Amino acid sequence: MSDYKNIKVEINKEQPLDEVVRELERLGYQINGWLENRIIRSVKTNHFGLYSGDFFDVDIIQGDLITLAELKEM
């Protein structure tokens, strides 16, 4: 069984994209999709250990919403 989870993190001034990505990669997640040249509103992960950026509102995306602070504690 994998330690990876279906989670989502909102991207904003308090939770910048580069910090969220740094923490996800520290936890072993790998990029799956694009992150550059777009207006990223959230980052989502899956139980396969992959993450990608999304421009949809976090309420639309499946997964548990966590904060950057919670991500750093994982």
Residue ranges and their predicted role:
Residues 1-74:
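Structural boundary micro-motifs
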